[in-house]
Every structure is written in C-alpha cells, then in structure tokens.
C-alpha cells in the first residue's frame, strides 16, 4: 500500500472560482504548506492563477505539487454535454499537463443548485440519457489521455445521477475499465448510504484516486428525514474529519492494505462557506490522524 496524501481548496471552503466568502488563494496555498501537505488539487478553475508560469512559481516556492483537478459538466445533455466539457478540458488540460499532473476528475452537474439547493434537473436519467452519459464520458477520457496524458476518474457525487451504489455499479458495468476509472469519495459514498470499505474491496481495480472525509451521522439523519438539499447539508456540517463520523477509517485502511492500494488520497472536506480561521486546524489534525493510523 502506498497512499500519497494531499488536500484541496474544498477543504478550505472553496467551491467557486470567485466568491467573497472564500479566502484569498495566496492564504490557501500558505496554509496548505503550513499544515504539512505536499500535494494539492487545483480546485475550481480560476480560483488559483490560470497563468501556468505564475501558478508554477507560487507552487514551487511553497514546495507543492499537483495531483489533478476536476471539471463539471452534464455529459448526458445531447446538445451541450460534450461541447461544454471539451471547452473545460481545453482550458484546464494544458495547465495540468504543464504541472505534471496525472488525473482529471469528471463531476456531473448536480440536479440541485449549489448555492440555493433548488432543483434544476430531473433526479433520474432515462435509458438514452444514461447511454449519453457513458458515451460522453468515454469521449472525454479518450481526449484527455490522447491530448494531455491524463487519466479520467469519474467522481461519484451526491445529488448526481451516479451517487448510489446501484447507480455506480451500473456505471462501472457500462464503461471501459481501460478508459474510465472511479474517484471514490468516502464522504459522498457514505452520504448516499453506501459502504466505502466494502466498495473499495470489491472495486479496487477501478479506483486509483480517493477523496477522504467522513459524515456526521446525526446531520445525515436530519438531512434524510427532511430531504434537505446538498448545499444546505454541507452548511449544516454534514462532512467532518476522517477521525469522526460513520466511516470506520481503520477498517478503510485495512481494506487499502489488503488490496495493495497505490494512489492518491486527497483530503477533501466540503465546508462551504467556512470562516477563514476554521480550515487550518482541521487540516493539521487530519494529516496527523491519517499518519497515525497508517494512511500516508
């Protein structure tokens, strides 16, 4: 087992390229380095500098390296799905390639608004929509690999069409293993009622990339009972440090050892919006905890 630990802007309360409730990017990078991390994701494109030379200089002076980043789109949309994803890839791809990153995560657009929680799309895809999702994901994976040397990992995510275990199983069955891998997010998986430990054991060959966080059981119960949307659930404190919550991280570590996992483990604890003094202590505690239990 070799887990390369990193973190992400998400763990500092960053969800958008620009928002007055988010801390300046310079402070984010400073605090990542202070907390002891060496690897990061770039976060929403435009939050960190998009000029490659500027970004490389800022990373280098803090001793930081980049594992990858993500794009968000609607691959099932017959009109805008591929064109939007291709634009996103053409913007982000050269930066990831220039920084030596290996992974591109695809996040399907939520069927609720990230800021308001209001419904914006159907909760379920029909058969044709699901096939478009699969086909567009394949196309994105092929293009990302051929043009930028990136491996595509599909981020199964709350309030998207691939969040519950049966939906993820169907997606895995429908996609080509040599093209499409899965980003297993322990928090999102548990949020949707799944067991990330068992899922890791079953599907480890398709999982080269992890997001590490936990879920507060009491908040999850309230969210489920009242059907509270994702954005509001995050603001309520749904996601917590790995040392707390419903996911048994010692058991998850054992699963990683048993399957001889080699890959990234990115600490990505959603906490938007977050007071500026909140993320750093959590980041330090989380890194210490993961090292203590033998992850990273």
Question: Which residues does each predicted region cover?
Answer:
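Conserved beta-strand positions in the central sheet of alpha/beta enzyme cores
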Residues: 41, 68, 105, 153, ...
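Active-site-proximal loop/turn and secondary-structure-junction residues that shape catalytic pockets
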Residues: 11-13, 44-46, 72-75, 108-112, ...
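Active-site mouth loops of central-metabolism enzymes
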Residues: 10-24, 76-86, 122-130, 240-243
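Metal-dependent catalytic neighborhoods of phosphoester/phosphodiester hydrolases
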Residues: 49-56, 81-86, 276
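Histidine-acidic metal/acid-base catalytic patches
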Residues: 1-36, 60, 100, 138, ...
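N-terminal small/glycine-rich loop or linker at the start of catalytic domains
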Residues: 1-17, 67-76, 112-120, 230
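Active-site acidic/histidine proton-transfer and metal-coordination neighborhood
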Residues: 81-182
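Glycine-rich, proline-tolerant flexible connector loops at the mouths of alpha/beta enzymes
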Residues: 39-59
């Amino acid at each position: 087992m070799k887990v390369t630990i990193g973190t992400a802007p998400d763990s500092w309360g960053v969800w958008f390229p620009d928002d007055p409730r988010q801390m300046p990017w310079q402070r984010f990078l400073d605090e990542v380095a202070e907390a002891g991390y060496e690897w990061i994701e770039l976060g929403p494109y435009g939050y960190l500098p998009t000029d490659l030379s500027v970004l490389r200089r800022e990373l280098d002076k803090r001793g930081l390296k980049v594992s990858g980043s993500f794009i968000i789109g609607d691959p099932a949309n017959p009109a805008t799905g591929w064109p939007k994803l291709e634009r996103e890839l053409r913007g982000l791809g050269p930066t990831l390639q220039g920084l030596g990153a290996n992974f591109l995560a695809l996040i399907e657009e939520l069927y609720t608004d990230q800021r308001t929680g209001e419904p914006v799309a159907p909760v379920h895809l029909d058969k044709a929509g699901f096939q478009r999702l699969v086909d567009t994901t394949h196309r994105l994976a092929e293009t990302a690999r051929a043009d930028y040397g990136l491996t595509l990992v599909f981020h199964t995510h709350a309030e998207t069409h691939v969040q519950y275990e049966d939906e993820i199983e169907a997606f895995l069955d429908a996609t080509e293993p040599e093209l499409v891998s899965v980003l297993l997010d322990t928090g999102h998986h548990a949020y949707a009622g799944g067991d990330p430990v068992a899922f890791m054991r079953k599907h480890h060959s398709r999982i080269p990339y992890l997001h590490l966080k936990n879920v507060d059981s009491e908040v999850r119960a309230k969210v489920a009972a009242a059907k509270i949307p994702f954005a509001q659930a995050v603001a309520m404190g749904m996601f917590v440090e790995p040392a707390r919550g419903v996911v048994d991280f010692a058991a998850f570590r054992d699963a990683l050892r048993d399957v001889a996992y080699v890959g990234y483990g990115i600490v990505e604890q959603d906490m938007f919006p977050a007071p500026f003094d909140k993320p750093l202590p959590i980041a330090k505690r989380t890194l210490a905890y993961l090292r203590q239990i033998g992850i990273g």
